[in-house]
């Protein structure tokens, strides 16, 4: 016994089968980075967030109150990270300095800019390039934690490095 399906059912079946097979294809990532660049970012401690890849060092880039100096060990680590990124074609980033709410807004803005510069320097030594608008002080405007506690203020005294596709 042979079933005779009308031509429209066969056509519909073939279209459905083609759509099902197309859905099984692997789609390359649309992040704007190559697989080698993503591997380098991950190996250096970057994590993907909504605005790019953010450096997430275990000791983080935290600062004592009213300080903008980076220790020699951190300078070397930052320079090494930059050199690794440059080796896979990532040659720039955004460096954002932040403060707690202690002090005036003007003082905190200047301090956060100095912190961003202190991190950008070793990155430049590692081969990265920056324009003036990529090294930014945010002052106290983007806190991670409440400034009501000493721990919260410590969390907010930081520098964030963000890498996005060129």
Model-found features: residue ranges?
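C-terminal motif of bacterial Sec signal peptides marking the signal peptidase cleavage site
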Residues: 19-23
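Bacterial signal peptide processing site
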Residues: 25-28
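Envelope-exposed proteins and targeting segments
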Residues: 51-53, 57-59, 66, 89-91, ...
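Periplasmic OmpA-like peptidoglycan-binding domain that tethers envelope proteins to the cell wall
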Residues: 98-166
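Bacterial N-terminal signal peptides that target proteins for export
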Residues: 2-13
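N-terminal secretory signal peptides
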Residues: 30-56
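Short, small-residue-rich loop/turn micro-motifs
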Residues: 57-61, 89, 97-99, 137-139
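Periplasmic peptidoglycan-binding/anchoring modules of Gram-negative envelope and division proteins
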Residues: 39-42, 47-48, 62-96, 124-125, ...
């Amino acid at each position: 016994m042979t079933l005779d399906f009308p031509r429209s059912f066969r056509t519909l079946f073939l279209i459905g089968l083609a759509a099902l097979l197309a859905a099984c294809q692997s789609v390359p990532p649309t992040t704007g980075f190559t697989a080698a660049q993503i591997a380098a970012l991950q190996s250096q401690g970057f994590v993907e967030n909504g605005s790019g890849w953010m450096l997430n060092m275990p000791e983080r880039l935290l600062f004592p109150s009213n300080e903008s100096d980076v220790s020699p060990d951190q300078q070397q680590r930052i320079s090494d990270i930059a050199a690794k990124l440059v080796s896979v074609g990532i040659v720039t980033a955004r460096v954002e300095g932040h403060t707690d709410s202690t002090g005036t807004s003007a003082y905190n803005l200047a301090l956060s800019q100095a912190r961003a510069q202190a991190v950008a320097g070793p990155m430049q030594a590692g081969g990265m390039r920056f324009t003036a608008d990529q090294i930014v002080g945010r002052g106290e405007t983007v806190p991670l934690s409440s400034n009501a506690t000493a721990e919260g203020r410590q969390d907010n005294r930081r520098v964030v490095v963000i890498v996005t596709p060129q």
